[in-house]
Amino acid sequence: MSAIVDVIAREIIDSRGNPTIEADVLLESGVLGRASVPSGASVGTREAVELRDGDAQRYYGKGVLKAVESVNGEISETIMGLDAMEQCFIDKTLIELDGSENKSRLGANAILAVSLAVAKAAAEESGLPLYRYLGGINAKWLPVPMMNLVNGGVHANNRLDMQEFMIIPLGLPNLREAVRCGAEVFSTLRTLLNKRNLPTTVGDEGGFAPSFARNEEALALIVQAIDEAGYQPGSEVAIGVDCASSEFFREGKYHLDVDGLGLTSAQFVDYLATWVEKYPIISIEDGMSEQDWEGWGLLTERLGKTVQLVGDDVFVTNTRILKEGISRNIANSILIKINQIGTLTETLNAIEMAKCAGYTAIVSHRSGETEDTTIADIAVATNALQIKTGSLSRSDRLAKYNQLLRIEEDLGEMAQYAGRSAFYQLKP
């Protein structure tokens, strides 16, 4: 009864108003699995390829009708009749059908939509929530959220070079209190911005997008917001920064335009280390450019024992690249973005490889999101212990937090909140 009898894709709209793909997988029993795919603005050069139409007369070239055609044609014909319970086999079949190294022929967006829809259909057929179907009886850890409070870089129309300034409520007793904490700090920050006559418009990921005179001003104001909201900076609420440094790495230097600086790799390491000394920063993402592996080595040597150093663009959820990074002692954490690699199986493999190497794995959204909540279930299913899914505004971000709250309720007394233990690679 779990045989696939129909696969249908369609073009829908994401949180930035751009087209993306949604797929339905129908089983013989009548059960339906549905999944939609996110899209990034800050994109690593080695990510799996998102297939766009390139027709300037339609959505300015961003349509996904070619990806829809891939699903409704070749992919549908190939997986029709297969057992939805055989996730690994189906994903392997999709990868082989595409035949390219980076899923550029059929499109990683087309392949991923089907891969996730298959998993959802199989979970429904099994009578299990998705997190339990994927993770089994040990899926009980609720991840620590990394909550985006200030947007910059390519995620906002402001002067900030850094892409994200986040709070991390690691000292709270459970997820529900962590979410409350995030909402209260977010509200307090809005009040502080209003008092300074700064705009409270939000960026792609729901964080505020004011134009500060310097990057560091965002950190100082966030610490003030944490304190005025009634929480302890550091012990209860730490800070994370996504530099997205590949976006401002040019001709061998890191150009921080708002600060008027052009820094070498070593100088940029010093710059970040100064922030770590002044503020309760526990996590830095993409602290070095994806091209600057030597810089990554310097950063890891300097801060790798006390700060979570997250590789996003440098690893792109790819086990081959992650394996090389582990062997060269690059970073100590990986950001997991399901559309960077393009199938559920490969995503789970990357998480497992990271954990086996003592790296943390952070399940992440993209700047262009939908109402799909799959990443919340994946975070719990894999005991990833951390999730990055935006701010406490915009329903595309809140959908994931609300799904985590439902999972916590579903787990009942079995639910455990990771808290500070989520940063197991750091020395106390």
Curated annotation (Swiss-Prot):
Gene3D superfamilies: Enolase-like C-terminal domain (3.20.20.120), Enolase-like, N-terminal domain (3.30.390.10). The active site is at residues 205, 337. This is Enolase. It catalyses: (2R)-2-phosphoglycerate = phosphoenolpyruvate + H2O. Its main location: cytoplasm. PANTHER family: ENOLASE (PTHR11902:SF1). Belongs to the enolase family. PROSITE patterns: ENOLASE. GO terms for cellular component: cell surface; extracellular region; phosphopyruvate hydratase complex. It is found in: Cytoplasm; Secreted; Cell surface. Its cofactor is Mg(2+). One of its GO terms (molecular function) is magnesium ion binding. Catalyzes the reversible conversion of 2-phosphoglycerate (2-PG) into phosphoenolpyruvate (PEP). It is essential for the degradation of carbohydrates via glycolysis. Pathway: Carbohydrate degradation; glycolysis; pyruvate from D-glyceraldehyde 3-phosphate: step 4/5. Its EC number is 4.2.1.11. It comes from Nitrosomonas europaea (strain ATCC 19718 / CIP 103999 / KCTC 2705 / NBRC 14298). Binds a second Mg(2+) ion via substrate during catalysis. It is an enzyme of class 4 (lyase). InterPro entries: Enolase, Enolase-like_C_sf, Enolase-like_N, Enolase_C, Enolase_CS, Enolase_N. It holds the Pfam family Enolase_C. Keywords: Cytoplasm, Glycolysis, Lyase, Magnesium, Metal-binding, Secreted. GO terms for biological process: glycolytic process. (2R)-2-phosphoglycerate binds at residues 163, 337, 366-367, 388.
